[in-house]
């Protein structure tokens, strides 16, 4: 039995990836019809939209994660395996790992996306990504550790590098992170670090295009720009990064910025798997799928979420890489596969539920079709939408209490610089 998964008379569906798409599909597919195997490198689901709040000490990591095994403990004939995929043979329907191989009948590719450094090794070496909970914790530790080091330093230049923060990418992640950092500078630094001059801390937000939040309307972009400018964020539009060194960044306008924390939020690319290279033929290294989420070049292979490139009449350049797309595709495909007659099928139709981004306390932008909201109402909408999509009652409650507490007292209670302790016996 490969991976201790018993043979079954039912068709075996293997899901690669436990993100929004893979997690939702595994919940919706009928285990009375199929044997289900969910493979992910982690044993938990992580709620990506709130990574930046973990990095800013606003919420604890466990409140945006949910154990996969706990979620499926009452569902029969589903097997969770924590593995790294080495290669997939879609012709013979075999998955290879370092542990062994596994045969499938139906393959669901939901590997998501990873940070795109555009082939620049320096960008990858000297910046901090924000695509996982572990990376969010690493960024949190970097921020706190550098502030502690800044308190000890009498060198103005060193303090500048330790206190300044540079964010590359003016999409939702970059905007939300810049706003959270600005509020930390205003409300937290003077109280926790009275020995430091908080006014010397600079937050730079760099965007290659002509506006922030360029996937939203111009109203949203302008509002985000105005609010962040009022909050003291230095915004660089129409500006590209030409080079990055250990603690210095060079911009296309000739400006040099110094910081030990350069955060990369400037784009993603599909997570590729060996053996599927021929399918990664779409922009952003995605896998082209038809209107039924099928990978046309192979039988019984489907792709969902960020890894899938699906063109529609409304989205000729492909559906956006958003959680609602992944969730809707997963529900659609599970419903299709649960039916016995797959020939009578309807094409996937994406329902655009709008987009939103928070800028700071009581500040957000929200758009749905022709409706545009900003300020407190949009912020409340952002809060409740994110609480709604969190997995687990405990997580919803903890995040709500943390947000309420932070709102009332202007403080964040999770500023802990926890460094991993490596046992001496492993230091070989």
Please name every model-derived segment.
Residues 76-87, 182-291, 297:
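A Rossmann-like FAD-binding core segment of flavoenzymes
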């Amino acid at each position: 039995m490969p991976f201790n998964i018993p043979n079954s008379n039912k068709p075996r569906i293997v899901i690669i990836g436990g993100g929004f798409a893979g997690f939702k599909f595994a919940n919706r597919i009928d285990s009375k019809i199929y044997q289900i195997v969910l493979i992910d490198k982690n044993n938990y689901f992580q709620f990506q939209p709130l990574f930046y709040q973990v990095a800013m000490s606003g919420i604890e990591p466990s409140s945006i994660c949910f154990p996969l095994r706990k979620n499926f403990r009452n569902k029969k004939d589903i097997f969770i395996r924590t593995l790294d995929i080495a290669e997939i043979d879609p012709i013979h329907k075999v998955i290879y790992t370092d542990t062994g191989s596994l045969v499938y009948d139906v393959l669901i590719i939901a590997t998501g996306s990873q940070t795109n450094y555009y082939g620049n090794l320096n960008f990858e070496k000297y910046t901090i990504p924000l695509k996982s909970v572990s990376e969010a914790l690493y960024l949190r530790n970097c921020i706190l550790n550098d502030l502690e080091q800044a308190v000890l330093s009498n060198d103005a230049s060193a303090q500048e590098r330790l206190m300044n923060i540079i964010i590359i990418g003016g999409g939702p992640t970059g905007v939300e992170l810049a706003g959270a950092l600005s509020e930390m500078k205003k409300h937290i630094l003077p109280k926790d670090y009275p020995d430091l001059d908080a006014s010397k801390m600079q937050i730079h937000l760099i965007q290659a295009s002509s506006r922030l939040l360029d996937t939203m309307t111009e109203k949203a972009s302008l509002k985000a720009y105005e609010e962040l400018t009022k909050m003291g964020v230095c915004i660089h539009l129409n500006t590209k990064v030409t080079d990055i060194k250990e603690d210095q960044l060079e911009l296309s306008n000739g400006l040099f910025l110094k910081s030990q924390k350069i955060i990369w939020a400037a784009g993603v690319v599909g997570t590729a798997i060996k053996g599927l290279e021929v399918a990664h033929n779409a922009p952003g290294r995605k896998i082209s799928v038809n209107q039924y989420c099928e990978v046309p070049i192979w039988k019984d292979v489907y792709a969902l979420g960020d890894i899938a490139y699906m063109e529609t009449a409304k989205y000729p350049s492909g559906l956006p890489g958003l959680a609602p797309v992944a969730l809707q595709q997963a529900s659609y495909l599970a419903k299709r596969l649960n039916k016995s007659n797959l020939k009578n099928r309807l094409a996937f139709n994406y329902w655009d539920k709008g987009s939103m981004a928070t800028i700071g306390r009581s500040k957000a932008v929200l758009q749905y079709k022709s409706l545009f909201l900003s300020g407190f109402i949009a912020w409340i909408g952002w809060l409740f939408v994110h609480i709604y999509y969190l997995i687990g009652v405990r997580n919803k409650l903890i995040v709500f209490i943390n947000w309420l507490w932070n709102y009332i007292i202007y403080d964040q209670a999770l500023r802990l610089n926890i460094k991993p302790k490596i046992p001496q016996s492993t230091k070989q």
